[in-house]
Design a protein with these regions (language model features):
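A conserved acidic beta->alpha catalytic loop
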Residues: 42-51, 102-104
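Conserved donor NDP-sugar-binding/catalytic core segment of glycosyltransferases
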Residues: 108-147
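Acidic helix N-cap motif at the loop->helix transition within catalytic regions
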Residues: 17-20, 47-56, 108
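Glycine-rich, basic loop-to-helix element that forms the pyrophosphate-binding segment
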Residues: 73-89, 112
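Short, acidic, metal-binding catalytic loop of nucleotide-sugar glycosyltransferases
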Residues: 24-35
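A recurrent flexible, glycine/aromatic-enriched loop bordering the glycosyltransferase active site
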Residues: 160-175
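Cell-envelope/extracellular polymer assembly enzymes that use nucleotide-activated donors
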Residues: 5-7, 37
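Short beta-strand-to-loop acidic/aromatic patch adjacent to the donor-nucleotide binding site
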Residues: 93-104
Length: 175
């Protein structure tokens, strides 16, 4: 039985310091490369983000790694990037992961996400809409924007860290 097709969507803007680590972590997944497509949707970076993505897309092709596609997002914002990515998905895509260009994942990340999704779907007898994962603190210093995001998510208007409340595996109701 072949592995379900997975697409990883990565909206980017000015990610030259992080995008290589992000993409390499996806290129080195234990999940079959033939069943994994990576869509990087760039919002007009003026640093070397686009050049790094182009270089890694070529490298991944040469190494029979996952397909990496770079798309231009003229609207710049993440919701537009998501919508644009949907137009480029392979028709047999079953699962979509979204990452940020600052993130990287362990080599078994996609394999574990797909297995858990299939397990939960099998238990409840239907497809489900989403699967979260625990965010592990970075080993890099938190930059200004990261500090803003952290402060926003932990304040009452940002949800007071609601995402951290859901720790069990399985279907759950969200507020």
């Amino acid at each position: 039985e072949s592995a379900p097709r997975v697409a990883t969507i990565i909206p980017t803007w000015q990610e030259e310091e992080h995008i290589e680590r992000c993409l390499r972590s996806l290129m080195l997944q234990s999940y079959p490369a033939t069943a994994h497509q990576i869509l990087v949707i760039d919002g007009g970076s003026t640093d070397s983000t686009v050049e790094i993505v182009d270089r890694l897309a070529k490298e991944s092709r040469e190494l029979d790694g996952p397909e990496i596609i770079l798309l231009e997002n003229p609207a710049r914002f993440v919701p537009h990037a998501r919508n644009l990515a949907l137009e480029y998905l392979q028709p047999d895509t079953e699962y979509i992961l979204e990452m940020i260009g600052h993130a990287w994942v362990p080599a078994d990340h996609i394999q574990i996400r797909v297995e858990r999704m299939q397990k939960i779907e099998g238990e409840i007898g239907r497809k489900i809409g989403g699967l979260g994962s625990i965010v592990i603190e970075s080993d890099l210093p938190l930059q200004k924007v990261g500090k803003w995001i952290e402060a926003t998510l932990s304040c009452p208007l940002g949800g007071s860290g609601q995402f951290a409340r859901f720790k069990k595996e399985g279907p759950t109701k969200t507020p």
